[in-house]
Amino acid sequence: MSARTKARKRALDVLYVADIRGESIPATLAVEQQRAAAEPDRQASWQYAREIAEGFVAHQDEIDELIETYSVNWTLARMPAVDRAILRIGIWEILFNADVPHGVAISESVDLASSLSTDESASFVNGMLARIAATQA
């Protein structure tokens, strides 16, 4: 597993935990930073995970509005928390990280959904992110 793939999973953990516990993302990041500092092998993935989470916080309103706009028959509150977190990461990478090709952002998000969410989540995530990426072409 690449460092970036691990970082996406760590960012997912941060966004998911903050969402489920009703905590702020910066507070959850601070806890994760303490864990990462205690485990030097986590440092490589930690840097990008933090960039993703902080990037989402900076653009949360815009990203969440896109999710609401492009999800058919689903509101943010109604979709599984893990799907919300995955979509937030994927959209941030598509819109705000020029170093990540759209196809990679979509593929990585779909892989996370396939392994961590419902049977329908992978196709839902794929469709949403593909539509959003198409607006950026």
From Swiss-Prot:
Highest taxon above the source species: Bacteria
Keyword annotations: RNA-binding, Transcription, Transcription antitermination, Transcription regulation
Stated role: Involved in transcription antitermination. Required for transcription of ribosomal RNA (rRNA) genes. Binds specifically to the boxA antiterminator sequence of the ribosomal RNA (rrn) operons.
Identification of the protein by name: Transcription antitermination protein NusB
GO terms, biological process: DNA-templated transcription termination; transcription antitermination
Pfam families for this protein: NusB
Cellular compartments per GO CC: cytosol
A molecular function GO annotation: RNA binding
Gene3D superfamilies documented for this protein: NusB-like
Similarity field: Belongs to the NusB family.
SUPFAM superfamilies given in the database record: NusB-like
Coiled-coil intervals: none
Species of origin: Clavibacter michiganensis subsp. michiganensis (strain NCPPB 382)
InterPro entries noted in UniProt: NusB-like_sf (IPR035926), NusB_fam (IPR011605), NusB_RsmB_TIM44 (IPR006027)
